[in-house]
Amino acid sequence: MQWSDEGLVLGARRHGETSVVLELMTAGHGRHLGLVHGGRSRRMQPVLQPGNRVRAVWRARLDEGLGHFAVEPIESAAGRLMGSRLALYGLAHAAALLRLLPERDPHPSLYAAAQVLVAHLTDPAIAPALMVRFELAVLADLGFGLDLSACAATGSNAYLAYVSPKSGRAVSAAAGEPWRDRLLALPDFLVAREAGGTGATPTPRDVRQGFTLTGYFLDQHVWHPRGVAPPEARELFVALGTADAG
């Protein structure tokens, strides 16, 4: 068995004296592991750092085997990311989110979204809002996507302001007002223009509301059912990314 693909390095763990088991999020083959002979060498260690984009050839006798990777660098982002605490926490959290996916299950749209996220992780004006959208995308690919297109009560797409914690569907400002204390806030940057969104740059408060929204559904549908706690990296990333939210 053999295939070639590009991938984002999620991590690597030591295997023996000279090798590593490399974990990639690939464009066409999903999250995939493989052995890299000589992965601990001086030449290969910089290539296999989390956040880097690589070209990988995977070979194995049987499709279900661990197999071996031959890896070449495409883009080295690790050096840039290491200089930013926000980026390091964001990268760790993004990797934890991708590990929620079944191994070897292709998710090409999430791979593309992860590349965009990694490219902007060092920018505090962009990265937090991108992470909220990335969490929404992970929820959708796990089968728990939110419907933010129209009001669950009226069917209208005008002035959407809330999300029902039960259905995961948007609710308009007027329809939700009597029950606002029971609903989750829908920040403006997640509302389409045709549904009343302004298109304005999200404020730290908007982003915090976004993380509250995604965090609720991740906990309800993913973390709690699997018996795992939210990643500490998420908490640290949210704290840094919304520091001015008050």
From Swiss-Prot:
One Pfam family, short name: RecO_N
Keyword entries, A-Z: DNA damage, DNA recombination, DNA repair
InterPro entries: ARFGAP/RecO, DNA_rep/recomb_RecO_N, NA-bd_OB-fold, RecO, RecO_C
GO cellular component: bacterial nucleoid
Domain of life where this protein originates: Bacteria
Keyword field contains Transcription regulation: no
Biological process annotations from GO: DNA recombination; double-strand break repair
HAMAP family registered for this protein in UniProt: RecO
Family as reported in the entry's similarity comment: Belongs to the RecO family.
Task of the protein: Involved in DNA repair and RecF pathway recombination.
Full protein name: DNA repair protein RecO
Lineage: Bacteria, Pseudomonadati, Pseudomonadota, Alphaproteobacteria, Hyphomicrobiales
The gene coding this protein: recO
